[in-house]
């Protein structure tokens, strides 16, 4: 993990392999290079239009899959080709291990003369091997697993599926890639030697019983001894000993041929055959042995092997009746080992992608990317820089914990390609520790990821604290407006598996002929919640926005927008960064999806999604997923802002449509939805709508006043009269208005202005309380049954009293609560064994350091009360073997013919031994000691200090070096 950028690079490479490789941060710190390999195949569809792709997403070598086609009548498979990386890794690298891999499988190419692509895809990940799959038909593929994260069904071939390699474990070894070793000049032409993939081989043994061989029907006809499943994709070594005896002396020399056939999925034609022959004669018929010893290179395995068959035949008719009995000279076995067969990912798990009903001769495209840690061969190593792997427990544990919660986070091995692309932003957030996870919140994952961060990477979580979100109660913005708030506060509309697509595809309502209309605008995937608090603007206007859903045209919800002077495109989501212009190029506005039909004031404005207006005038705006604002209410707001509003932001929401004469406000529909959005922050809606009988659910008193026409915005003659009404409503003291209208307006703006009517204020609070607790329907039904409120009055005449403060729990319950609390803290720290019962037995104490260390090392539950002091490193104050310290100190301080080390240097060496628990210094400490010795030697000597005397050096014993050759003047 790169702590400078606070990015979990290993996890990012797993989730988004196309971003490049990243070293696996485990404790294998071998030198390596990072290598990314691509795979690209255009597979031609057969006449049947059906086939299957066998993918090995975790294979550490170059072979990543195979392609089969169904025959014309779909009764049998036909092998087409292997799927491999673009470079054969064993040509340049000796060792390697896989970091991550991804495939994209889809069709977008038509054969000549056709105009439509047909066909669907089914994909499933199977935890077993290929030979264990019972049926490979299109329909039966979905029965391989019940895990929804591991299968996709009936996906159009034009949409495609994505196969993602999720590690099944993190103890990945470096495997030999079957590279060829350098050969001598005298080697036979074509002869070569390779290092086989022999790490964790998968070994199969065929044990034959000590019984008579089944009789053959005729000479030269094979009789089966054993047939079964086996999975092989790499080089294989075969060994065997089949011994038997004949009941009678053979009349003629009889040849026994024992044949081991390796076969694939598609037919009974052997891929590789191993044969062992032996002659039974008069001399050996009491004990005949056929030996099998053969190596099969990877090149000879031309397709995946899933079956083996052992059989035999004879060449003499007279020997058919001569009974042969196995096991005369010992066990009869045939074994074969597949290289790297038990390395995770080589043979299991597999992902099967079946296609059906595709257009014959169309093209199925397979595009993959694989990331490796590789060690180059000696020739390549001369020109490449290798680097040590770095152990990063935080990065590794973070990846482990994220992937262990794959069900909760909906991380899959197979995806619909469009869904995988939707998750790209979320994956980038999860791997970025400096991110506050705004998109992850939209998917309902933020709490899980934050909890994992606190446990797996507490240091980085401290260095890069999450920005305190302003959202909190802001969940009401979407949750309340769409009526989808969950009981826990998270809105269902953005939950994984909920109506997130409807919300993400929402559009601001507007004219279909606008240049940024829904039909023309190309949506960007976005669900990024960011909130910014701005100081009070010089002026502004608030307008409602009605969002419609593309997939459900009848559904809609509302929100608010504030239009202020200035250019603030950085505060808009990517979908809203649209610049429109007033008529005759007299100004512009960001965030409006259509040009303004009237002239402006040569200024630039920005329409921002509004979250809240605070008491001090500050405004809180947010980035949301909707598209640019469109519609007549936005045009009305701009007209007011350009022509009438000179200072401040009116605490109300304006709606209406400007007529063609630009002097009249005509009625507009959708006021009920807009009222809900306006009353959420406590603002009244000022506007006009056709009809006065519509009822608005869950709104404040202002909605009723608007619907009944109490706050009119009627047709008027001339813009001055029109502006007169709106301008007076905007003023803090609306002089000139009707006295009754002024009183009603002030009462309904109790939350936006100072409270002037206590009864209306209580009524508004009561309505908010009823809505908050979801009692509106119940209260309405009660009002119909009890119109005079007789029963209800008796029920609520006496409000509930707070009971007396209860006494504290007794000692038993207090100890149980304490044990539960200690257990929760211990489990969060990683001590899963610390149940409340265990804590109680441990004298109501959490795990000690020794107990926790014992659990980490052995994986077993420690005994309560046992401190396991042997598992705690005991500090050693000072070693007792001072002779060892003095020898090392003299050796480090100087050569034998130099002066001995001073006492201060002895103390420094002793401190190192004490720090290391009795062990000697490591490389860094040795370097520090040498530097200390050089500093001590450079100290100026006092004239009065006598020079230390030392014994004269002993002369070297006579004799010659053992490296000097014999002779007088010989050269070395």
Curated annotation (Swiss-Prot):
- Give the keywords, sorted: Capsid protein, Host cytoplasm, Hydrolase, Metal-binding, Protease, Serine protease, T=13 icosahedral capsid protein, Virion
EC no. given is: 3.4.21.-
Q: Name the site position(s) for Cleavage.
A: 442-443, 486-487, 495-496, 508-509, 715-716, 734-735
Q: Does the keyword Protease apply?
A: yes
| An annotated GO BP | proteolysis
Any single GO CC term annotated in Swiss-Prot or TrEMBL for this entry:
T=13 icosahedral viral capsid
**What PROSITE patterns does the database record attribute to this sequence?**
BIRNAVIRUS_VP4_PRO
Binding residues for a divalent metal cation: 26
Annotated catalytic residues: 633 (nucleophile), 674
One Pfam entry name: Birna_VP2
How is the protein altered post-translationally, as described in the entry?
Answer: Specific enzymatic cleavages yield mature proteins. The capsid assembly seems to be regulated by polyprotein processing. The protease VP4 cleaves itself off the polyprotein, thus releasing pre-VP2 and VP3 within the infected cell. During capsid assembly, the C-terminus of pre-VP2 is further processed by VP4, giving rise to VP2, the external capsid protein and three small peptides that all stay closely associated with the capsid.
**Source organism superkingdom:** Viruses
Give all residue intervals belonging to the Peptidase S50 domain: 509-734
Biased segments, Basic and acidic residues type? 801-817
GO terms assigned for molecular function: metal ion binding; serine-type peptidase activity; structural molecule activity
Free-text function comment from the UniProt entry: Capsid protein VP2 self assembles to form an icosahedral capsid with a T=13 symmetry, about 70 nm in diameter, and consisting of 260 VP2 trimers. The capsid encapsulates the genomic dsRNA. VP2 is also involved in attachment and entry into the host cell. The precursor of VP2 plays an important role in capsid assembly. First, pre-VP2 and VP2 oligomers assemble to form a procapsid. Then, the pre-VP2 intermediates may be processed into VP2 proteins by proteolytic cleavage mediated by VP4 to obtain the mature virion. The final capsid is composed of pentamers and hexamers but VP2 has a natural tendency to assemble into all-pentameric structures. Therefore pre-VP2 may be required to allow formation of the hexameric structures.
Protein name, as recorded: Structural polyprotein
């Amino acid at each position: 993990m790169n702590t400078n950028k606070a990015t979990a690079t290993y996890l990012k490479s797993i989730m988004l392999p196309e971003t490049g490789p990243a070293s696996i941060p485990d404790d294998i710190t071998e030198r390596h290079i990072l290598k990314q390999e691509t795979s690209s195949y255009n597979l031609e569809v057969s006449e049947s239009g059906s086939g299957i792709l066998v993918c090995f997403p975790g294979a550490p070598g170059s072979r990543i899959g195979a392609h089969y086609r169904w025959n014309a009548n779909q009764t049998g498979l036909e092998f087409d080709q292997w799927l491999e990386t673009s470079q054969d890794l064993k040509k340049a690298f000796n060792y390697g291990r896989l970091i991550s891999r991804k495939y994209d499988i889809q069709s977008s190419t038509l054969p000549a003369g056709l105009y439509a692509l047909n066909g669907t895809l089914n994909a499933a990940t199977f935890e077993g091997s290929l030979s264990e799959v019972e049926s490979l038909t299109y329909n039966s593929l979905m029965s391989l697993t019940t895990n929804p994260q591991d299968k996709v069904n009936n996906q159009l071939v034009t949409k495609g599926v994505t196969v993602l390699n999720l590690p099944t474990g993190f103890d990945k070894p470096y495997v030999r890639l079957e590279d060829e070793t350098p050969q001598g000049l005298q080697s036979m032409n074509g002869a070569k030697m390779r290092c086989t993939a022999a790490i964790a081989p998968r070994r199969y043994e065929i044990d034959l019983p000590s019984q008579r061989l089944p009789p053959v029907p005729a000479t030269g006809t094979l009789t089966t001894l054993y047939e079964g499943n086996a999975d092989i994709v790499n080089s294989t070594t075969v060994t065997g000993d089949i011994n038997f005896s004949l009941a009678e002396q053979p009349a003629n020399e009889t040849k026994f041929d024992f044949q081991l056939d390796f076969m694939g999925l598609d037919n009974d034609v052997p891929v590789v055959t191993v044969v062992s022959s032996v002659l039974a004669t008069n001399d050996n018929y009491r004990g005949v042995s056929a030996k099998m010893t053969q190596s099969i290179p990877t090149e000879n395995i031309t397709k995946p092997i899933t079956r083996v068959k052992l059989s035999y035949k004879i060449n003499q008719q007279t020997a058919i009746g001569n009974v042969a009995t196995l096991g005369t000279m010992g066990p009869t076995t045939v074994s074969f080992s597949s290289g790297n067969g038990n390395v995770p990912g080589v043979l299991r798990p597999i992902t099967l992608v079946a296609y059906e009903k595709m257009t014959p001769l169309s093209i199925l495209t397979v595009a993959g990317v694989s990331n490796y840690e590789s060690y180059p061969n000696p020739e390549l190593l001369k020109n490449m820089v290798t680097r040590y792997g770095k152990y990063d427990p935080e990065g590794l544990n973070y990846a482990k914990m994220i992937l262990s919660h794959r069900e909760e986070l909906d991380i899959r091995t197979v995806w619909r390609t469009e869904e995988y692309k939707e998750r790209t932003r979320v994956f980038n957030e999860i791997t970025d520790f400096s991110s506050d996870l705004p998109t992850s919140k939209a998917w309902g994952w933020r709490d899980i990821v934050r909890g994992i961060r606190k446990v797996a990477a507490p240091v980085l979580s401290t260095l890069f604290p999450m920005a305190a979100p302003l959202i909190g109660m802001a969940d009401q913005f979407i949750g309340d407006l769409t009526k989808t708030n969950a009981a826990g506060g998270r809105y269902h509309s953005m939950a994984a598996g909920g109506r997130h697509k409807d919300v993400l595809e929402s559009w601001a309502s507007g004219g279909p002929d606008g240049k940024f209309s829904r039909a023309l605008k190309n949506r960007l995937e976005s669900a990024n919640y960011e909130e910014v608090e701005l100081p009070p603007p010089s002026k502004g206007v608030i307008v409602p926005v009605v969002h419609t859903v593309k997939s459900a045209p009848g559904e809609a919800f509302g929100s608010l927008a504030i239009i202020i002077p200035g250019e603030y495109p950085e505060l808009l989501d990517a979908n809203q960064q649209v610049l429109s212009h007033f008529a005759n190029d007299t100004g512009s506005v960001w965030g409006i999806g259509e040009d303004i039909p009237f002239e402006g004031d040569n200024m630039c404005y920005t329409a921002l999604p509004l979250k809240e207006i605070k008491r001090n005038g500050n405004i809180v705006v947010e980035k949301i997923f909707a598209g640019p604002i469109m519609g007549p209410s936005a045009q009305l707001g701009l007209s007011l802002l350009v022509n009438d509003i000179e200072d401040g932001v009116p605490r109300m929401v304006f709606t209406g449509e400007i007529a063609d004469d630009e002097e009249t406000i005509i009625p507009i529909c959708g006021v009920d939805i807009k009222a809900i959005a306006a009353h959420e922050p406590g603002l009244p809606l000022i506007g006009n709508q056709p009809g006065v009988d519509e009822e608005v659910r869950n709104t404040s008193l202002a909605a009723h006043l608007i619907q009944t026409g109490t706050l009119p915005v009627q047709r008027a003659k001339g813009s001055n009269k029109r502006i007169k009404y709106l301008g007076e409503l905007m003023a803090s003291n609306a002089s000139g208005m009707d006295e009754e209208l002024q009183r009603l307006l002030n009462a309904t703006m109790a939350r936006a202005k100072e409270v002037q009517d206590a009864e209306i204020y209580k009524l508004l609070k009561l309505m908010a309380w009823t809505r908050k607790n979801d009692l509106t329907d119940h209260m309405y039904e009660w009002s119909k049954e009890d119109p005079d409120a007789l029963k209800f009055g008796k029920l609520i005449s006496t409000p509930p009293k707070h009971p007396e403060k209860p006494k504290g729990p007794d000692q038993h319950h207090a100890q149980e609560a304490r044990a539960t609390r200690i257990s929760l803290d211990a489990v969060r720290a990683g001590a899963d064994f610390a149940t409340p019962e265990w804590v109680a037995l441990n004298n109501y104490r959490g795990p000690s350091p020794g107990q926790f260390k014992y659990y980490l090392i052995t994986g077993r539950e420690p005994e309560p009360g046992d401190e396991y002091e042997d598992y705690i490193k005991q500090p050693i104050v000072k070693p007792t073997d001072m002779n060892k310290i003095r020898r090392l100190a003299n050796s480090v301080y100087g050569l034998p013919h130099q002066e001995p080390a001073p006492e201060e240097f002895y103390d420094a060496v002793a401190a190192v031994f004490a720090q290391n628990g009795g062990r000697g210094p490591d490389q860094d400490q040795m370097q520090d000691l040498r530097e200390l010795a050089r500093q001590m030697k450079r100290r100026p000597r006092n004239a009065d200090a006598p020079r230390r005397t030392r014994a004269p050096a002993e002369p070297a014993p006579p004799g010659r070096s053992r490296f000097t050759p014999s002779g007088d003047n010989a050269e070395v």
